[in-house]
Amino acid sequence: MTESTASVLYEVRGAVALVTLNRPQALNSFTREMHHALWAAFDQAEGNPAVRALVLTGAGRGFCAGLDLSELDFTPGPGLLERADPGPVINDAFNPTTRRLQSLRMPVICAVNGVAAGAGASVAMACDIAIAAPTASFVQAFSKIGLIPDAGGSWLLVERLGL
């Protein structure tokens, strides 16, 4: 996971694990493979007793644009609703990621360097602390596309606001 073509980069700097979402050409939108690579980075950090904190950030101009829609199949025809349903990837990938972020044995700091959209915003909110650059923005536009917030977004937003 250290080569520059990996979807998630992992490095240790002193007592800090730096985890970088590394698909800048797609605004670091998540694929299933990327979730698995992120979980492996979490395992590395937790398995290293020298690591006392984790920083999560994105490469390029965005933090994370949420789900990479190429993970879904929008080909017209029978079964379209099942193939285009984001539910399975939310349940199998995003939900475990946000739960895992909240259960790591160390503080997790999200360095939001650009747009954090949809489930990407939920991932940022699942961290213990989010630090937003002047270029950062948080977008929850689910209602505009007929969805409800996923990856714990509804609960995490209320929690972070202290309501």
Describe the residue ranges of each PLM region:
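Conserved CoA-thioester-binding segment of acyl-CoA-metabolizing enzymes
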Residues: M1-A59, T75
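Glycine- (often His-adjacent) and acidic-residue-rich active-site loop
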Residues: G58-R99, A116, G146
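Hydrophobic/aromatic residues within transmembrane alpha-helices
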Residues: V19, L56, D68, V123-A124
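Crotonase-fold acyl-CoA enzyme core
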Residues: R99-L163
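Charged catalytic carboxylate motif
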Residues: E33, A37, A93, R100
